[in-house]
Amino acid sequence: MLFVSILISQFVTCLTQPDFFERPPPPDWFFPGPLRPWGPPPPWHRNRGPPPFGPPPPWDRPPPPWRRPPWHRRPPWGLPPPPPPPEPEPQQDQPQVMFSQDIDKVVNSVNQNTAAFQRPGESYDKVIQIMSSYFNRKSGSQYDINTVIPSSGIYNNEMAANSKIAAVMFESDMALTVSQMNKVAQNGFRVKRKMNLNGTTWSRNIPYRFLDTDGNWQSQITNGLRHYERNTCIRFSLNGGGSDYLVFSKGEGCYSSVGRLGGPQEISIGDGCETLGIITHEVGHALGFWHEQARPERDSYVRINRQNAINGLEGQFDKRSWSEVNEYSLPYDYGSVMHYGPKSFSKSSTMNTVEPVDPAFINTIGNRVEPSFLDLKLLNTAFCSNICTNRINCQHGGYADPNNCGQCTCPTGLEGTYCERLQTSNCGVELPRADYSWRNISYSGSSDCYWRIVSANGGNVRFELTYVMYRCSPVCEEFVEMKAEYSHEATGYRQCCKAVLGERISKGNSVLIISKATQNSQFVLRYREDGTAPTQRPPPVRVAAPRSYSLLWSGWTRCSENCGSCGTQYRERCTSTTNCLRSAKQTRVCNTQPCAQGTTRGKRSVLQTQISHRVKRLNGWCCARFVLSRGVCVPVRTGVTHPN
């Protein structure tokens, strides 16, 4: 009975083990496999012991030692099993953003007319998604792609025409590709300064086509292309051959892609975009131009007031990094046709988002009249530098004309083979040289005129615009401009509404003055050489001699000291009004009145050498070897009593 009790106890103990009922079935290798196709089966002892994980070992090798497989232990009796891990949530696509009607037209037009957006996964919808995410991260607020940019109607630029679509364009008018937008989002800056030349450069022959038959609209675009042809080596051919070409559409606003993308690419010149400045601006993007105010050194030239920008659009004011910049050694240009205006993306027409560090340029930035001299110089440097092999010594920032290599292309206001002379005009001249007296220049008319001021002694020129009356606008389109840098290649101060410059000083020894107007305009400017005239020693006083040439003395010179009989003065005797004999010279003590009480340094007496110590003078005093007598400093005489 004892044996039976022990056996039952052991059996019950086994049943209560936690893993008794949870043991997994034996693995597949525990069961004998199928027989070999021929021959007798192997001896039974060959199958003893489990093989390692994987297929059974070859029959001609002994199996590896058996290892106990890991058991899945269950929790102790009475505790519930742990809950299963939560299933991963299914990936949900971002909600589809509803476009406004105007934006929907733009997106469809870009996708349809630009081949780069027809590749799988690279539609312009994807660009907008990346841009929205980037702007949300930059601003910390929700970016609304349907934002309408306020327009005061006084700016004649692409921002005014794009008020309903600017929020889906990078920097208001650039339709970037997915690759370009990813670089911006990842790095926070773009690839090049104003030129995007990483494998996306056009040849010098660029074909283009029109999608609209409006003759006047086509003529205005052709005029903009001819402006580039006259000033660069680039040529545009209507309906020219080639798989890569520009497509001009009359779309919703003004926009363009940047650089050569491959295949057809759209440039939209919609209503309000048909001016020379805006057309050349958008074509400039297609040629590779970025915006000027995004240069890496821009903080030395402009201040960005992000607090005045529309919420969510702060990312539209990024600048680039020095690590990937190609500047071609050209200076910052306030007058570039690619520069933002002062109120770009502003909350209000009374707030500036972009302000020049030098406030004199506030009416210069945002130019949409025509490309500046430096805009054209940059294009010629990028596209045409290998045309003129001969070196020509151009002055004042000029460069060899790619359309005539024996001639310099000169900054506005200069001309000549080497840019050495003032540009010819009916109303401008070389002004009288600036000396140390103020001179005035005034003008009234409606022509393009040029003047130049040069200092007489090689110094700087100080000038002041005292009166201005041109057609007034926040960004001057008709203006008087003053170029005062060492080189005259960069755009100068432009004024049109009122004289606010105050006195300015040129960096070099000359100033160029340019007037551009189509209606009667006036200005008044004064100028002089900076500094004061060098001090010259006055000639000695000459006394006219009688006909007998008797010897007469000149007047006494100024006393060398102010008091105390400490100073001397002299005079010369002349034989004529032009020939004084220096040997005939008289000297005397002067200014004999006593010096006031107080502390004084030792002075050199006229009768004794230096008095080197400080003396506290309680009363009026005289220099050494002089004594105060009756209010006058007189020489000390031995044995003589001097009354006070």
UniProtKB/Swiss-Prot annotation:
Top-level enzyme category: hydrolase
What residue spans carry the region label Disordered? 40-70, 75-94
Q: Where in the cell is it found?
A: Secreted
Query: Which residues lie in coiled coils?
Result: none
Q: Which residues bind Zn(2+)?
A: 281, 285, 291
The annotated regions of Pro residues compositional bias extend over: 40-68, 77-89
Q: Which BP terms from GO are recorded?
A: molting cycle, collagen and cuticulin-based cuticle; proteolysis
| Disulfide-linked positions | 233-384, 254-273, 388-408, 410-419, 559-590, 563-595, 574-580
InterPro entries registered for this protein in UniProt: Astacin-like_dom (IPR034035), CUB_dom (IPR000859), EGF-like_dom (IPR000742), MetalloPept_cat_dom_sf (IPR024079), Metallopeptidase_nem (IPR017050), Peptidase_M12A (IPR001506), Peptidase_Metallo (IPR006026), Sperma_CUB_dom_sf (IPR035914)
The UniProt note on the cofactor reads as follows: Binds 1 zinc ion per subunit.
Q: Which domain of life is it from?
A: Eukaryota
Pinpoint the Peptidase M12A domain residues.
193-385
Pfam families listed in its UniProt record: Astacin (PF01400)
Domain TSP type-1 per the UniProt entry, residue ranges:
547-596
- Name the glycosylated positions: 198, 440
Specify the CUB domain's residue ranges.
Answer: 421-546
List, for all copies, the residue spans of the domain called EGF-like: 380-420
Signal peptide start-end: 1-16
Is Plastid one of the keywords UniProt gives this record? no
Enumerate the GO terms in the molecular function aspect: metalloendopeptidase activity; zinc ion binding
Q: Which GO terms describe its cellular component?
A: extracellular region
Query: PROSITE patterns, alphabetically?
Result: ASTACIN, EGF_1, EGF_3, TSP1, ZINC_PROTEASE
Function field = Metalloprotease.
- What PANTHER family would the database entry show? DISCOIDIN, CUB, EGF, LAMININ , AND ZINC METALLOPROTEASE DOMAIN CONTAINING (PTHR10127), ZINC METALLOPROTEINASE NAS-33 (PTHR10127:SF823)
Q: What is the protein name stated in its UniProt record? A: Zinc metalloproteinase nas-33
- Gene field: nas-33
